[in-house]
A protein has these predicted regions:
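Hydrophobic alpha-helical transmembrane segments of ABC transporter permease domains
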Residues: 23, 27, 31-35, 75, ...
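ABC-type nucleotide-binding domain
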Residues: 325, 331-578
Length: 578
């Protein structure tokens, strides 16, 4: 679908309002075009009649003009009110579509794109699109109708002078077209630069605690100043082009008046034109110049709106790498058997992370993955949830290839507890309920008790209605972790992934949370990724992964007797041996 056709699709639900808006704009144009003719008639004929005739007709004329302008005012109200509502509705529809698309896109998209730039598309771009969606067609319609209507009327009054005005207008349009190209380039550049500014701002504010803890405020100020100044230079370039565009058009508008005076005077001197007709031309020039100014604004609005819509379309045209297959079925009655069959994965052609992994995990079994950073432990679990697709091999749950089941049913059966806990802006209850939206308060309390966080919550003045702060800034790391565990208790999945769930906590917090995790992992297939080896001693099987793939596997005691890589890690951690 072309950009223009896609844009028009958003008008469909509001086509009644749209056409009524244009109809009201048409009425306004007719009124504006009629007044110079009425005034010309009055000065050239009506006011030259006798006093009695003028007195008889002037009140009728006044009432007619009054009604005409009341109708125009009502039309103006509709255009200003309902037209803007239509634009706001379209903006809302686009914003929802964009957000929905962001929810569908795969992790690989977010690996390559900056959040600040994505935010810019949701906020700045859509505002410009909304302004264009409402004002664009309306302004274009009014302007063209007035310009064409004025020319037709002027041509019927005295075509030689109208033809001269048309010549000046054509030159003006050629100038506008040439400047238009330059404006398009600068507006696109502006969009890129404001995205960089938003990205820099979000990065700095999101990491403000790190910034201040390292006393690196000056570095962040310099970084932001750099992107801010680049945006400023881009805007200056844009304004230079815009200034040339608007200044040139202003010159041509003045030239139209000069043309009327000079050529009109010559025609009067030759006896081909009378002063009243020239005055009528001058009145229509005012009607004619006003829409030209609106057209100038329209071109600027068009560039902003369509630049934003093209960026909007770039996202909407993105095809999620991870999607349900055509005949995908729901994953039901899950026991929790997991098979990694010759699984390999690479992010890029030259970046192989996992190579030929074969692993069978029985339902209810506790498996631990151990290895150096970058060995693919977290990636292996990401493949299980289909955040990425395997490059080679297959992953099966209860014998079903995960590519053959729906993403929603797959991920609904997998619970994830990570080191970096993300809490949404909202209350503690809302954050726990994220594990199963629609859960009752009693179910949320039950999950919190299992996660050993209920007593702490009840000690707070507002209890479960306590506001967490942005990303949970009002809570400690251990408290946030227990809330995330409560989420998974509420979700009640058959498969559990613990990804460095306690590595960032102090010993006391780890002790409390480890008990919660042990309760959580009961009767579930559990995969634990850990650097603290004390947390996995009781695992049914420990798998050591390094750059070459699966290196060792067995229970804690078996691997210690093997005296290999795992034993080395364990001794370094607990005995301080080389």
């Amino acid at each position: 679908m072309s950009t223009f056709k896609r844009f028009l699709q958003y008008y469909k639900p509001y086509k009644g309002i749209f056409f009524m808006d244009l109809f009201c704009a048409l009425i306004m144009c007719i009124v504006d075009l009629s007044f110079p003719l009425i005034l010309s008639y009055c000065t050239g004929q009506f006011f030259l009649k006798s006093s009695n005739e003028i007195l008889k007709g002037v009140f009728v004329l006044g009432i007619g003009l009054f009604v005409m302008y009341v109708i125009r005012a009502l039309c103006r109200y509709y255009v200003s009110c309902q037209g803007h509502v239509m634009g706001a509705n379209m903006e809302s529809d686009m914003r929802q579509d964009l957000f929905n698309q962001y929810q569908r896109l795969s992790f690989s998209y977010y690996d390559k794109h900056n959040t600040g730039v994505m935010m810019s598309r949701v906020v700045s771009d859509l505002f410009d699109i909304c302004e264009f969606a409402h004002h664009g067609p309306e302004n274009l319609f009014i302007s063209l109708f007035k310009i064409v209507g004025s020319f037709i009327i002027l041509a019927t009054i005295y075509w030689p002078l109208a033809l001269i005005l048309l010549t000046v207008t054509v030159v003006m349009m050629v100038f506008s077209y040439s400047q238009n190209k330059k404006m398009r380039r600068t507006f696109m550049e502006n969009r890129k630069k404001i995205g960089s500014v938003n990205a820099s701002l979000q990065d700095s504010l999101g990491g403000i605690r790190v910034v201040q803890s390292f006393a690196n405020e000056d570095i962040e100020i310099d970084k932001f100043n750099h992107s801010n100044m680049e945006f400023l230079e881009s805007k200056k370039d844009n304004y230079r082009v815009m200034g040339t565009f608007q200044g040139g058009n202003n010159f041509f508008q003045g030239l139209l008046y000069v043309t009327i005076i000079i050529f009109g005077g010559l025609f009067i001197a030759n006896g081909d034109l009378n002063p009243i007709v020239l005055a009528t031309f001058a009145l229509y020039i005012n009607v004619f110049v006003s829409p030209i100014e609106v057209l100038v604004e329209f071109t600027e609005m068009f560039q902003k709106g369509f630049s934003g819509f093209r960026r909007f379309e770039e996202v909407m045209n993105e095809v999620p790498e991870i999607q349900d297959s055509k005949n995908a079925k729901d994953l039901e009655n899950v026991s929790g058997n997991i098979d990694f069959d010759h699984v390999s994965f690479q992010y890029t052609e030259n970046e192989k992370v996992i190579d030929d992994v074969n692993l069978h995990i029985k339902a209810g079994e506790k498996i631990a993955l151990v290895g150096p950073s970058g060995s693919g432990k977290t990636t292996l679990c990401s493949l299980l949830s289909r955040f990425y697709d395997v490059t080679n091999g297959s992953i099966r749950i209860d014998g079903q290839n995960i590519k053959d089941v729906t993403l929603k049913s797959l991920r609904s059966n997998i619970g994830l507890v990570q080191q970096d806990v993300y809490l949404f802006t909202g209350t503690i209850e809302q954050n726990i309920a994220y594990g199963r939206p629609g859960a009752s308060h009693e179910e949320i309390v039950k999950a919190a008790k299992k996660a050993n966080i209920h007593d702490f919550i009840m000690s707070l003045p507002e209890g479960y209605n306590t506001f967490c702060g942005e990303r949970g800034t009002r809570l400690s790391g251990g408290q946030k972790q227990r809330i995330s565990i409560a989420r998974v208790f509420l979700k009640n999945p058959k498969i559990l992934i613990l990804d460095e769930a306690t590595s960032a906590l102090d010993n006391e917090s780890e002790r409390i949370i480890q008990k919660s995790l042990e309760d959580l992992s009961k009767n579930r297939t559990c995969i634990t990724i850990a650097h603290r080896l004390s947390t996995i001693r009781n695992a049914d099987e420990i798998v050591v992964i390094d750059a070459t793939g699966m290196h060792e596997r067995g229970t804690h005691d078996e691997l210690m007797k093997l005296n290999g890589t795992y034993a080395k890690y364990y001794k370094l951690q607990f005995e301080g041996l080389n």
